[in-house]
Amino acid sequence: MRSIQRRLSVGLFAVLLVVGLVLAQTGLWLFDQGLRRYFAGNLREEAENLLVAMVRGPNGMQLDEQRLNPAFQRPYSGRYFVIELEKDTWRSRSLWDSELEVPHKKGLVQGLVDGPEEQRLLVFRGHYKRMGQKLRIVVAQDYTPILESFARVQWMGLGAGALALLLVLLLQRLTVRRSLRPLEEVRLQIAQLQQGQRSQLDNQAPEELEPLVEQINHLLAHTEETLKRSRNALGNLGHALKTPLAVLVSLAEREEMARQPELQQVLREQLEQIQQRLGRELGKARLVGEALPGAHFDCAEELPSLCDTLRLIHGPHLQVSWSAPPGLRLPWDREDLLEMLGNLLDNACKWADSEVRLTVAQGEGMVRLKVDDDGPGILPDQRQAVLERGTRLDEQVSGHGLGLGIARDIAEACGGRLSLEDSPLGGLRVSVELPLQKSGRAARA
């Protein structure tokens, strides 16, 4: 059970149910005991009235029926008595042919006694002395109507308690939902962080959530600062190595080295491998994958300037176009996507005759990037080799052969894949599929 609201509801239901049942049963028990004490007083008065009804007769003591309560005369009326003397016993006519169990102790009997017609009797026994003779008077009253009333009250109480419990649970559910609303706001803000619509969470949060919000904002700032330092360090490393490598390349091309062609060729190959390996590893090290807050890739903002730059580099004869859904923002790091698309478009421009086309589409939980050119293309059996580190099929084309490899590394860092296909333009199509499940849905501006 992971839902906080469900846990609170179940816990509150259990507590209220137990407390309600205990309170209800305790209340009924206390009320029952109070009623029994009240009836005990009435039964004592009845016993004393019966004692007064014992008068002297011709043959000794006798019961004056004129003084009896009429209920003692009706059969099974619920009011009974038994008077015991040493030699005589008087029973109320209401007992008819039934017997009344005489308790062994005087006073109110603990519990109820079985009576006629399945009645439950409250019984009182008193010891008295009249006219020099000892008497034992047992008086009983039917307690069944009281028990039936208690049962009705219990069922009514259970019904009312159930309704009250449901009402309390409903109010508690509304209260908890309202209390947890700040968490929903934090969740929405985190989703906005993923979509690049904000750089940090709002500091105005409930007191209980302030430490969490502060830690998340601190983590975001620390992550962004760490990434900036890492990128700066990698950039500095790349610049620092360029000069020594340029010196070594220059030395390899000197006339002195031309006199030793084998050594010169080995030196060239090793230097080129160093440049390839350095460029690829630096490119892999700086990958971010999912974007930092506020660093998403806005297609409408980034792609026009990227295409204009490529036209300036490769000449006005080349038509570089792009298409994307209006307002589409991709939930990956801006620098990573710029580098990936820059490499793919630059590679396409080098091989294209007159046209390069970039298509961005979204659907089925994926973002698809397609770069098409009208160049010579690549044979299917050679496409895997092109994706290998630093491989170039034509040494006449400038570059170190790193573009497709770096683009594939970036695609994999974003959880996607890169593939080579035939282009409708007649050349090569480089297709990149990036899943939205890992980074959240692409945002529309």
Curated annotation (Swiss-Prot):
The modification Phosphohistidine is found at residue 239. It is a single-pass membrane protein. This is Sensor protein kinase CarS. Residues 177-228 form the HAMP domain. One of its GO terms (molecular function) is ATP binding. GO terms for cellular component: plasma membrane. Residues 1-24 form the signal peptide. Keywords: ATP-binding, Kinase, Membrane, Nucleotide-binding, Phosphoprotein, Signal, Transferase, Transmembrane, Transmembrane helix, Two-component regulatory system. The keyword Iron does not apply. The chain crosses the membrane at residues 150-170. Residues 236-438 form the Histidine kinase domain. Its EC number is 2.7.13.3. One of its GO terms (biological process) is phosphorelay signal transduction system. It comes from the Bacteria. PANTHER family: SENSOR HISTIDINE KINASE TRCS, SENSOR HISTIDINE KINASE YKOH. It is found in: Membrane. It catalyses: ATP + protein L-histidine = ADP + protein N-phospho-L-histidine. It is an enzyme of class 2 (transferase). Member of the two-component regulatory system CarS/CarR that regulates the expression of multiple genes involved in calcium signaling and homeostasis including CarO and CarP. May function as a membrane-associated protein kinase that phosphorylates CarR in response to environmental signals leading to activation of specific gene promoters.
